[in-house]
Regions:
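Short polar/acidic secondary-structure junctions
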Residues: 73-76, 123
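C-terminal regulatory/oligomerization modules of transcriptional regulators
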Residues: 102-163
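N-terminal helix-turn-helix DNA-binding core of bacterial DNA-binding proteins
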Residues: 13-54
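Canonical helix-turn-helix DNA-binding module
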Residues: 45-73
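Alpha-helical linker/hinge and terminal dimerization helices associated
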Residues: 65, 96-107
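Short aromatic/hydrophobic contact patches that present stacked aromatics
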Residues: 47, 83-85, 117
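Basic, amphipathic "hinge/linker" alpha-helix immediately C-terminal to the N-terminal HTH DNA-binding motif
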Residues: 23, 75-97
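N-terminal leader segment of winged-helix/HTH proteins
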Residues: 1-19, 65, 156-163
C-alpha cells in the first residue's frame, strides 16, 4: 500500500465563508442599495420590494458580521427608526458587486444592453473590475492560476492508494 498523500481541506475555504455571509437571497441586493445611498429601513424595504421580516434578518446578519452599522434616528414627532451604513469591511465588497454586475451585463442583459452603467465620478470613465497579479499583469478569465496552500490552510489525508 502506498503512502497517504495530503490534500488541502476544502472545508476551510474563503469562498465558502464569504458565500455563507453574502450568498443568502436578497443580501447582495441589500448591499447594492446601501452602496447606492439607500440607508433607511423603510426606504430599503420599499426600494427592494422585500418582506420586512426578511430585510430585518438580512440586515441583522450584515450588522453581526461587521459589514454594516445600524444607527437610530428620529424625525420630529415620529418614533425612533434605523438607518444602515456600510463599514470599511462592507465597502471592501464593492469590487465583488461590480464583478457580479459585469457578469450580468455581459452574459444576461437583454438585447438593448445593460440597465445601468457605472462611471468614475471624477473623470466619467467606465468602472471595471480587472483580474491581475501582484506584478501588474492583466489576466483574462481563462488564465492559468496555481492554487497553493496559504497560511490558514488545513490538510487532510486522502484515502490510501493501493499498489
Amino acid at each position: 500500500m502506498a503512502t497517504h498523500p495530503r490534500e488541502l481541506d476544502s472545508t476551510v475555504c474563503s469562498i465558502a465563508r464569504t458565500m455563507e455571509l453574502i450568498g443568502q437571497p436578497w443580501t447582495m441586493l441589500v448591499l447594492r442599495d446601501l452602496f447606492n445611498g439607500v440607508r433607511r429601513f423603510d426606504e430599503l424595504a420599499e426600494h427592494l420590494g422585500i418582506a420586512r421580516n426578511v430585510l430585518t434578518r438580512r440586515l441583522a446578519t450584515l450588522v453581526d458580521a461587521g459589514l454594516v452599522t445600524r444607527r437610530s434616528y428620529r424625525e420630529p414627532g415620529q418614533r425612533a427608526r434605523h438607518e444602515y451604513r456600510l463599514t470599511q469591511a462592507g465597502h471592501a465588497l464593492r469590487p465583488v458587486l461590480i464583478a457580479v454586475m459585469a457578469y450580468g451585463d455581459e452574459h444576461l442583459a437583454g438585447p438593448e444592453g445593460p440597465p445601468v452603467q457605472l462611471e468614475h465620478a471624477d473623470c466619467g470613465a467606465p468602472v471595471t473590475v480587472r483580474l491581475e497579479c501582484a506584478e501588474g499583469h492583466r489576466l483574462d478569465p481563462t488564465a492559468r492560476l496555481r492554487v497553493r496552500p496559504g497560511p490558514g490552510a488545513r490538510f487532510r489525508w486522502s484515502e490510501p492508494v493501493s499498489d
